[in-house]
Amino acid sequence: MQNELNPILLSQNSIRFATRVAIFFIIRDELVEAVTWRHPVKSMCLGLTITLLYLHPVSFSAILLLVFLTMMPISMTHDVTTNLKDLQNFMASYSSSYDQLLYFRQNYYHHITPSAISSGLLVSLVLIFLLAYLRISIDRYLPIAIWIGLISLHPKLRSYLIQFYSAKRDHVPYLQIRNELAQVWRHVDISGSQTTTRYTSFPKFNPENSVTSLDLVEPPENYSWAPQSDWTFVPPNEFRRFILWSPQPPKMNRKSSHGSNLPL
């Protein structure tokens, strides 16, 4: 219903409209919940709605045209009075729609729970509406990209991808050695009373025998692994372990009365 321009009514509608702009923030919060999969039903409905809007935008054009003509009727004149009247009626229609939406949310929204039955029912209704208008062409890959992006934002997949990326970024040399069985080399550095064995896939000086696993690495001659020591990964591509000096006692020989050498 289109009312004639009235200053008092225009002022009242302006106040009503100013107190009901929270709907835009509510929509923003709902979109955040849908994109981040906090509410799976909203996420599925968002993906289906975007798919339908892309494949068949004409399906929404009739609804948008009806709303536009109802709120903002076409005027043959461009005077200030007509514009103010349209603005007055638009604010009144918006305020009434907001009040009805708020009434539905307060009285009926609690029945739509994220349980299995209600979730399946709501998704099925949207899916049926989508399939009724869906005609996929081979050259339209944007919906597939939209769904891949939406699914990748799921908490489980998102945490898996972040964990995989972090492990790949922080432990690439370690994973490369363990998985590809790359030949690695052992080096010995002597510093003071302790000796450190470095285990790396990039030899920097004369290498010893190559091995394919840390389990096959033996301490240098006359050395043993330090007690309670283990291999430690040192970025970017080294493994280190402490060793201690433990020489084998030399074998001493003695001469018998007949001149032969007898081991002690």
From Swiss-Prot:
Enumerate the InterPro entries for this protein.
Peroxisomal_Membrane_PEX28-32
Q: Which residues form a coiled coil?
A: none
Q: Where this protein primarily resides, as one coarse class?
A: membrane
Q: Which UniProt keywords apply?
A: Membrane, Phosphoprotein, Transmembrane, Transmembrane helix
- What subcellular locations does the record give? Membrane
Q: Could you provide one GO biological process annotation from this protein's UniProt record?
A: peroxisome organization
Q: Which residues carry this modification: Phosphoserine?
A: S260
Membrane-spanning intervals of the chain: 48-68, 112-132, 142-162
Q: Which GO terms describe its cellular component?
A: endoplasmic reticulum; peroxisomal membrane
The membrane topology of this protein is: Multi-pass membrane protein
Which superkingdom does the taxonomy of this entry point to?
A: Eukaryota
Q: What is this protein called?
A: Uncharacterized protein C737.05
